[in-house]
Design a protein with these regions (language model features):
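Alpha-helical segment proximal to the catalytic Tyr-Lys
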Residues: 1-189
Length: 189
């Protein structure tokens, strides 16, 4: 058993910033390797939208949340790459990183968590495609078949900690249809 700790930062925040965000403080506070209780711990940080790229990329990320799906996939990929049955998953997020964190947990609840073998066989794009299906009945049917063939049986998330969550992407009053697939409901698992 090991602990997988995923830390999703807010808009424009990155581990290399001069000022250290609270999410980065959480990431740095976790002892990687063998923890004090003898359990192996791994930490993965997902930088905030708008934290990298050219100025226009940073502005679009900050203003409209561009890059969020890339961050969700990066966090999900990290979990799939490192998860083994009985591992504990802890996910933290701040601001748009809270949205990212909830979406990652929603993706795990919706499509399941890929096994390492299925990840190696490039099924991550399939998982993302199914997660993006807007019709709930169609998504549920596709996800059930996908989970049975490519995912771990049951992957509970031990802890989801989010603070100052941003409730939406884009600009109020304009269409947000592209981002409506994100599952932000809290699962009983």
């Amino acid at each position: 058993m090991k602990r997988l700790v995923l830390c999703c930062d807010g808009t424009w925040n990155s581990p290399v910033n001069a000022s250290v965000s609270n999410i980065e403080k959480i990431a740095r506070s976790v002892r990687t390797g063998i923890g004090p209780d003898g359990v192996q711990q791994m930490v993965f940080s997902v930088e905030g939208v708008g934290a990298q790229g050219y100025l226009v990329d940073r502005l679009l990320g900050g203003a409209f949340g561009y890059g969020l799906t890339r961050n969700v996939v990066a966090g999900y990929r990290h979990l799939a790459l490192n998860y083994e049955p009985d591992d504990e998953i802890y996910v933290f997020g701040f601001s748009r990183g809270a949205y990212t964190a909830r979406s990652i947990v929603g993706m795990v609840a919706t499509v399941g968590l890929l096994t390492q073998d299925s990840l190696a066989r490039d099924h991550l794009c399939d998982a993302e495609r199914i997660y993006r299906v807007r019709d709930a009945a169609q998504r549920s049917e596709q996800a059930a078949a996908f989970r049975a063939e490519h995912c771990h049986d049951h992957v509970p998330v031990a802890f989801l900690g989010v603070f100052d969550p941003v409730g939406a992407l884009g600009v109020p009053g304009l269409s947000r249809r592209r981002s409506r697939f994100h599952d932000l409901r809290l699962s009983t698992d």
